[in-house]
Amino acid sequence: IMPFWYTLKYDGKTKKPVVADVYKTANPSVPITEPLTALRNAGMTIIPTITDGTDQMILANLLAKPVSRKQVVDAIVATVASQNYDGIDLDFEGFAFIDPNTTWKATAPNWVLFVKELSAALHAEKKILSITTPYLFNPAEAQKGYFVYAWAQIAPFIDRLRIMTYDYSTSRPGPIGPIAWTEKTVKYAISIMPASKVYLGL
């Protein structure tokens, strides 16, 4: 199970990234220990999702500097340790939908370094690293998709890739996830990593 319980924020006072607990805000009268106990008693693997709650280019700039990149890593690892989660899922959509696509080439290598460093820290504690992103296509083709997420480069470091194979049509009526479109991104994904790592969001 992958509950949306956390979001990454930037604290302007401390000038540091923080992982904010949105579960507590939404459920002030129900301690998080209650659902955690129920889920664990049911034998569930618990991998919460962290969304990107920062403003335009904030996360990209944090990942561009070794010190602040490590701060992001440390904040995420501390969140996993706080409730002994089985791992974490990153749903950082700001690169795709908030930052200008002209920044993607500069952001991608810093994203790869971040994933590599986070992976090492989590795997040292035997935790799972899952990444959720919009679609990518083969970069050799004209239509590349959201190449900022650099699937081929992060593939060795992640345990799961969750592809957002939906929202094909947004501003106008149309299909949510056409089969040909979905198959194209899946074929690319399984050409660069084991199929066992690839999950579809429908």
What do these predicted ranges mean?
Residues 12-30, 96-202:
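Substrate-binding surface in catalytic domains of secreted glycosidases
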Residues 65-92, 147-169:
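Structural recognition of alpha->loop->beta junctions
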Residues 6, 44, 51-53, 93-95, ...:
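Solvent-exposed coil/turn segments that connect beta secondary-structure elements
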Residues 2-76:
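Glycan-recognition patch characteristic of GH18 chitinases/ENGases
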Residues 42, 83, 124-127:
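Helix C-cap/helix->beta junction micro-motif
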Residues 37-38, 78-82, 120-121, 189-192:
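Surface-exposed acidic, glycine-flexible loop patches that form ligand/cofactor-binding
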